[in-house]
Amino acid sequence: ANDLPDAGDDDGPNGEVPAAYGWRRRWARQGVICDELSVSALALNLPASGEGLTSGVVFNHRRCGEPVRLTLRQLGDAKLEVPPGTLVRICENPSVLAHAATTLEGEAAPLVCVEGQPNSAVLALLNLLAADGAEFAYHGDFDWGGLRIATTVIERYGAEPWRFGVADYLAAAPAGTLLLDPPGAGATAPWAPGLVEAMTAHNVAIHEEQVLDDLLADLVEGERQN
């Protein structure tokens, strides 16, 4: 039992694969094949220029303005080689990426969708982009789960908030119809002091689909919106 692989490695965004991927690889070396295909990352228009299969897949999807879904297996040894300083926007919900692909096609700015709490494939993709020198801007749902996801991404990758502050919530709150549950003791938004208090006071959730026009405008203009 002492020889079993350890799943608890603390891998960071500096080019390393996330712990779950390294764990699968260590099992594989002992003859136990773990699933590298059931988790994937969704992206649009990443400016990859590296050699290899995965970079080529990303490049060709960008030429057509089409979303690409990459498995953990594809990402494990990939080198995307996006230009340093590339701003990659990150959203929580695939509907944002789908609308960007449909309406903007190849004109949309680079976008990654975490589809909830980031899985090991999403972390692997973001690690590769971070290692290439990409910068990140994050938007998610204004609800308690959305804040937890945002905290993970913003703290791990130093992402800028993208229309995800107090003023953005207050501007959208009048359109809110879904009531929030009580926030609980752990609710926090370190990048936006006062956001938890504003959400608690107004007691409505604002999901990305409700501010989709603003997000799409940023994606076509390529401008930073904090």
List the model feature ranges, each with a label:
Residues 165-166:
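Catalytic cores of secreted/periplasmic or lumenal enzymes
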